[in-house]
Amino acid sequence: MERWQNIHKVVVVGLGITGLSVVKHLTKTQPQLTVKVIDTRATPPGTERLPEQVELHSGGWNTEWLAEADLVVTNPGIALATPEIQEVLAKGAPVVGDIELFAWAVDKPVIAITGSNGKSTVTDLTGVMAKAAGLTVGVGGNIGVPALDLLEQDADLYVLELSSFQLESTLSLKLKAAAFLNLSEDHMDRYEGMSDYRQAKLRIFDNAELAVVNRDDQETFPDTETPLVTFGSDEQAYGLEADGNRTWLLDHGQRVIASDELKLVGKHNLANALVVLALLKAADVDYHKSLNALKTYTGLTHRCQVVADNRGVKWVNDSKATNIASTIAALSGLESTGKLYLLVGGVGKGADFTPLKPIFATLNLQLCCFGADGDEFMPLHESATRFDTMEDVIQQISSQLKTGDMVMLSPACASFDQFDNFMARGDAFAALAEKYA
C-alpha cells in the first residue's frame, strides 16, 4: 500500500488495550516494519502480551527511538502538546492515533459519534439496531473494543464512538455520517478552553459525507460547509411531536414511534434515539426493520438503565452519573406519573450541588441522601432525608411505593466511599431492586 512505502520504523507510544491493538495490527498487516513501544510507566499493562520481536522501553521516554521513527502512533491519553511529541512533529514525521490507522485499513462504511454526553448510548444503540436490520456490525472505538480489533470481524458497517482526544490525532477518516451530540465543559485540564475543546470535536466532520447536529446546541454545527441534518426537541427534521399526553419521534414530519413504547428513560434518551435514526438512514440501513430493537433497548448498564419494572414501579440505575451535569441530564424531561424517589450522595469531589435545586423544585420528589457527602444535598429540597447507605434507603422506602412511582439512583457523586467503583454501586442497586421490587 502506498501509505507504507516510506515507512520502515514505527514507534507506538503508550501500551494498554489501545497500544496492544496497534502493535497486533501492525505486526499482522505490515510484517516488514520494525515496531517499538515506549511507555513512561515503569510496568505498563499488557507487557506480557507483546510479541517477542517488539522492543519495549518503559519508565520514561526514548528520544533516540522517536528521532529515528518514520511514524509515531500515539495513545489518545497523551496530548499532542507533550514536548517529546512536538519534537517528532517538528522534524516532519507523522504522528497519528489508532483511529487514523483504522482509517487507512478500513474498506467498509463507517459512522462515528462524538459529544460530551450520551455518545456511548448512541453508539451502542446504533449498533444494536443495525444488527437487528440484518447487518454484521463492528462497534467500538472509545467504547468497548479498540477500533483496529474490529477490523478482524469483517463487518458490513462500523460504528465508532470517538473522543476529542482520539480526534486530535485522526486526519483522514472517511465517514458515511458523523454525529456531534452536544458540548459541555469537560477535560479543561487538557484544553486551553471551550473553543479549543470544540475544535477537537469538530474534526469528526473533516471527511464526513453528512453531519448530524443538535438544533438545541449551536456549538455542534460545523464551521465549514458540510451537508447536514439536525435533531432536536421541536418538530423539524428529526424531532419530537407532543400530541395530548404522548410524544412521538419524527423523521421529517413522519411519526416513527411513540416515547411510551420505549423502555429508555428521559428526554435526553429520546434525543439519542433520534440521532440513531438519522445515522442509520444515512448509512442506508432501513431502521423500520429494527424498531422492535429500539422498543426493547434498556440502555447501557449504569446509564439511566431500567433494572426492574414491577407493579407499575420503575427502578432506574444511573450510577454512571458521577457529576452534577449527568444527574441534570437524567432528570431533564423525566416522564413519571407518580413520585420520584431519587438517591443521591457518595463522594462529592468538592462540587457545588446548588444547580440541582431548581430542577428538584419541578419534580414530585422524595430526595434520599446517603454516603459520605449526603449532607451536601439536604438543603436542596424540603423532602430530603438522610440515610447512611443505599440499602438503608431502599429498606425504608420500599413499603411506600405505589403504581406510577420511580426509584432512581443518579447520585451526582463518585462511589468510592462505599463501593469500588460506579459499576459496583449500580450492581448493588440492581440487586436491591430485584429484592424489593
From Swiss-Prot:
It is found in: Cytoplasm. It is an enzyme of class 6 (ligase). Its main location: cytoplasm. Pathway: Cell wall biogenesis; peptidoglycan biosynthesis. GO terms for biological process: cell division; cell wall organization; peptidoglycan biosynthetic process; regulation of cell shape. Its EC number is 6.3.2.9. One of its GO terms (molecular function) is UDP-N-acetylmuramoylalanine-D-glutamate ligase activity. It holds the Pfam family Mur_ligase_M. Keywords: ATP-binding, Cell cycle, Cell division, Cell shape, Cell wall biogenesis/degradation, Cytoplasm, Ligase, Nucleotide-binding, Peptidoglycan synthesis. The keyword Cell wall biogenesis/degradation applies. It comes from the Bacteria. ATP binds at G115, S116, N117, G118, K119, S120, T121. GO terms for cellular component: cytoplasm. InterPro entries: Mur-like_cat_sf (IPR036565), Mur_ligase_C (IPR004101), Mur_ligase_C_dom_sf (IPR036615), Mur_ligase_cen (IPR013221), MurD (IPR005762). Gene3D superfamilies: Mur ligase, C-terminal domain, Mur-like, catalytic domain, NAD(P)-binding Rossmann-like Domain. Belongs to the MurCDEF family. Cell wall formation. Catalyzes the addition of glutamate to the nucleotide precursor UDP-N-acetylmuramoyl-L-alanine (UMA). This is UDP-N-acetylmuramoylalanine--D-glutamate ligase. It comes from Vibrio campbellii (strain ATCC BAA-1116). The gene is murD.
